[in-house]
Amino acid sequence: MAGYISGDTRKVTTHRLVEMKQRGEKISMLTSYDYTTAQIVDGAGIDVILVGDSASNVMAGNVTTLPITLDQMIYHGKSVVRGVKRALVVVDLPFGTYQTSEYEAVTNAIKVMKITHADALKLEGGVEIIDAVKKIIAAGIPIMGHLGLMPQSINKYGTYTVRAKDEEEAEKLLSDAHLLEETGCFALVLEKIPASLAERVARELTIPVIGIGAGGAVDGQVLVVSDMLGMTNGFSPRFLRRYADLHTVMTGAIQQYVDDVKKGDFPNEDEQY
């Protein structure tokens, strides 16, 4: 088992991720949005923590990722960074903060990095945002790309179904992947695309390719932490594996607490001053 458990407390860097790909070591990645969860995830040995704009769904209850603001992402980013010693921390730039102009993209990227002290940022898109990616990287900020299903573009596509199933879209994705690498991205997330296409991308690129619903032949995997811990009900995509049933555990614990309070069993004599 990796991480603190095995005594490997060296800080994960973008360079180390490339080295992991080169030696065939899979990269583990999970989301976190708060200090306490980040401490646990980091201490368990995760390689990369993504402060995802999925906080819009998980933390705020929104239907999409679109409503979350830059300041809200900064708040979550700061909270996570404080809890992390080893993992590489990547923060999503939210919708509307890098699409309008290169100047605004760089300004917002610098703001996030200066305030959160994160290690890198993630942006969704290919050729459409490549000028913004170039400028941000030129400012010295590491960028992780994101292709395939892009939640920030949900209103464009209208569905969360598998992307790049037809030849035209697959070829564009492949072209965008190469373009992002050539522009200087240190890694790439592929979301919900055919496993065969993801395998080809991972094989052709020298940078790490991390998948979510993209098969097992990529260089690493990412999941939303509350999903894989079984905290959410009613969400069961094909790619999700639940490693715990915390929804049941937490519900039972809270019900027991309520019962103890109602009966006067809490606090007992040992729990008083």
UniProtKB/Swiss-Prot annotation:
Pathway: Cofactor biosynthesis; (R)-pantothenate biosynthesis; (R)-pantoate from 3-methyl-2-oxobutanoate: step 1/2. It holds the Pfam family Pantoate_transf. The keyword Cytoplasm applies. Its EC number is 2.1.2.11. Its cofactor is Mg(2+). The keyword rRNA-binding does not apply. It comes from the Bacteria. It is found in: Cytoplasm. It catalyses: 3-methyl-2-oxobutanoate + (6R)-5,10-methylene-5,6,7,8-tetrahydrofolate + H2O = 2-dehydropantoate + (6S)-5,6,7,8-tetrahydrofolate. Mg(2+) binds at residues 53, 92, 124. One of its GO terms (molecular function) is 3-methyl-2-oxobutanoate hydroxymethyltransferase activity. One of its GO terms (biological process) is pantothenate biosynthetic process. SUPFAM superfamilies: Phosphoenolpyruvate/pyruvate domain. Keywords: Cytoplasm, Magnesium, Metal-binding, Pantothenate biosynthesis, Transferase. InterPro entries: Pantoate_hydroxy_MeTrfase, Pyrv/PenolPyrv_kinase-like_dom, Pyrv_kinase-like_dom_sf. NCBIfam families: panB (TIGR00222), PRK00311.1 (NF001452). Homodecamer; pentamer of dimers. Belongs to the PanB family. This is 3-methyl-2-oxobutanoate hydroxymethyltransferase.
